[in-house]
Amino acid sequence: MFLKAVNCFNEVKDREFIAKCIRDVIMEVGPSNVVQVVTNNAPVCKAAGLIIEAEFPSIYWTPCVVHTLNLALKNICAAKDTEKNSIVYKECSWITRVADDAMFIKNFVMGHSMRLSIFTSFSPLKLLSVASTRFASTIVMLRRFKLLKTGLQQMVISEQWSSYKDDDVQKAQFVKDTLLDDNWWEKVDYILSFTNPIYDVLRRTDTEAACLHLVYEMWDSMIEDVKKAIYTHEGISNAEISTFHQVVHAILIDRWTKSSTPLHCLAHSLNPRYYSIEWLSEDPNRVPPHQDIELTDEREKCFRRVFPDADERRTVNIEFANFSDGREGFGNLDAIVDRDKMDPKTWWLVHGARAPLLQKVALKLLAQPCSSSCCERNWSTYSFIHSLKRNKMAPHRAEALVFVHSNLRLLSRNTPQYHQEETKMWDVAGDEFGSLDDSGFLEVANLSLDEPGLEAGFINNI
């Protein structure tokens, strides 16, 4: 639910101000009804989150997983040439060069109506000018280039391209040489292959759906899949060392270390699927959460904050022992079989009554999101309501309109029409009503990475 907007005119957006805004909302809904506060990873937001944690020990500040992954991709795909970052730049600078080449080609083709006309005659799809504010913008652009490979190559070997003289010959030749260079396309394929696991996690977490309990496993699997892609491309065994993988791995681990919280570990530990034989047998290295030392330490930290009373904490620890070991009613056949068959929240509703304290915590955590994507849609809603042409609206009036629009949109998601035909997922692309024609330029800053099936359909229809 969208609660309210805050007029920050003439306010200093420091940690105290942000903490006050968050505190006011917490008091409005009640501290006992708040599990976490999700923000981006900006230092001022982190500082505000720590203030909130100090005042409300049972509430966690959680950095947005999508923003964290986007920062990791930026560290990899746009490494800075600094003294402290010299090793990363040495291993990853080739990615930046490939991305820069793609950006140059895109600008060259889209920057002139004649070149754009030649391109559109060879491809039914349009080139996308991806906003840098969009998550994984470099990867999105390269994925689009991969789809357009045949059309781009046909364009530069066509008679129209060769006969068009009123242009920069050197730049046109560079574009032609690059697009016909198999080595360049192999680099594009390599970038997409090892970043694909990261991109997949971005798509799965960039949503308002409950996925906090999935984050720990997704990160773990993502890191392994990235390693597999790099080692496969380099043709080396797991026993050998890849310096490029070491750099990428260090970036991902560093981002996970900075963004993970005990709440992620507790939510993971309360997912019945991770105790099922089916899940454990998928990988010989997997162990149930109660046998993992890191998860155990973080879970105990979380319990100490959520249950400050020692007797209550002892009770919930006993309940967790029964749940994780399949005792005291959790060991009946239905409860064990349903671990892998049921949605985690449904499982706790059906089988969790024997552990009332743990059930209450589980139902809260299994309903939590892990990103701030929903807030970004509210920003686009406000931008639509308060624009250059409609700029005399009082703040309270604009807030009321955003409140009504945002909550009506959320309510519409529960209607059958939201999942059918012309109105299917109508709000995924945000609230922009600008033309998508004219120059073939598409600004997709507000296009979410969630609903992957719709994303493909939305882009391919342009």
What does each model-identified segment do?
Residues 1-5, 266:
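Acidic, metal-ligating active-site segments
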Residues 17-21, 114-116, 352-362:
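Short, motif-level signal for alpha-helix interfacial/capping segments enriched in acidic residues
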Residues 18, 22, 37-40, 52, ...:
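Mobile genetic element proteins and their domesticated derivatives, centered on retroelements
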Residues 5-27:
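Active-site beta-loop-alpha junctions of metal-dependent nucleic acid enzymes
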Residues 9-11, 35, 76-104, 162-163, ...:
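C-terminal regulatory segments
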Residues 41-46:
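Short acidic, Gly/Ser-rich segments with clustered Asp/Glu that frequently serve as metal-coordination loops
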Residues 127, 132-137, 141-144, 189-190, ...:
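C-terminal reverse transcriptase regions that engage the nucleic-acid substrate
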